[in-house]
């Protein structure tokens, strides 16, 4: 694709790449919050594959002036504000939809992997960013490199960290429901803390997240979950 873009056009086609904070691997405590200059040492195939593509894009920019914007997501979450679109993985692996699914079910439970991390409550801390805010960042990043033909790299997060227990407690508050918690062993390779430093994106792209806190993100995810379950119920009623 990259070769074709430079062959067929007088100007290479701008590329906005969805990368990940997983390229940073296990940052040191003094590297939190994570800036774009934090060393990249991915510890899993997902992070390594994203870093490989980043390096290829950077090489193409240097060799062919390919306009590139690399966006390193932190934990994408939430649903469309209207409730029409949201996370629906099979199998589900993301924390917020797993918690909401457990809350929706009678006698549901959520497994917490690790309660002995060096954090204030012993569980992992993550930086959650709303999917709509990520989409807006893509548009802003594309417009920038169309105009200046540059190479740009940005961390996309809210710059706030929430523990697994805080996610569960916030989801309980939003839904008004209770949930059973099962404590389990750590998962290998889970960093204790991942929090972004998003100031570069805010300064250069004029990016301003509309969902800056966990509760607002979970409310949109819960609206989506209710919409999805109602859709399933209607299909069963109609024999679909």
Where are these regions (language model features)?
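Catalytic helix-loop patch of NAD(P)-dependent Rossmann-fold dehydrogenases
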Residues: 11-14, 23-70, 75, 82-94
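Active-site proximal helix/loop that lines the substrate pocket
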Residues: 20-26, 78-81, 117, 161
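C-terminal substrate-binding subdomain of Rossmann-fold SDR/epimerase-dehydratase oxidoreductases
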Residues: 98-240
């Amino acid at each position: 694709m990259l070769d074709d873009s430079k062959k067929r056009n007088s100007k290479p086609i701008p590329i906005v790449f969805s990368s990940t904070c997983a390229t940073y691997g296990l940052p040191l405590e003094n590297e939190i919050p994570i800036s774009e200059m934090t060393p990249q040492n991915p510890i899993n195939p997902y992070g390594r594959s994203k870093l490989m593509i980043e390096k290829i894009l950077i090489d193409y920019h240097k060799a062919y002036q390919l306009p590139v914007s690399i966006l390193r997501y932190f934990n994408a979450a939430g649903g469309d504000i209207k409730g029409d679109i949201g996370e629906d993985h099979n199998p589900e692996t993301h924390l917020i939809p797993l918690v909401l699914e457990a809350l929706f079910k009678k006698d549901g439970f959520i497994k917490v992997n690790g309660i002995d991390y060096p954090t204030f409550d012993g569980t992992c801390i993550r930086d959650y960013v709303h999917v709509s805010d990520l989409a807006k960042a893509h548009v802003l990043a594309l417009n920038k490199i169309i105009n200046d033909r540059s190479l740009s790299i940005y961390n996309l997060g809210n710059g706030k960290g929430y523990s697994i227990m805080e996610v569960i407690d916030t989801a309980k508050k939003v839904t008004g429901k209770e949930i059973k918690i099962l404590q389990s062993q750590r998962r290998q390779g889970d960093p204790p803390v991942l929090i972004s430093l998003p100031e570069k994106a805010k300064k250069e792209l004029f990016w301003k997240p509309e969902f800056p806190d966990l509760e607002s993100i979970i409310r949109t995810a819960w609206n989506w979950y209710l919409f999805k379950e109602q859709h399933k119920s209607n299909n069963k009623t109609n024999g679909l």
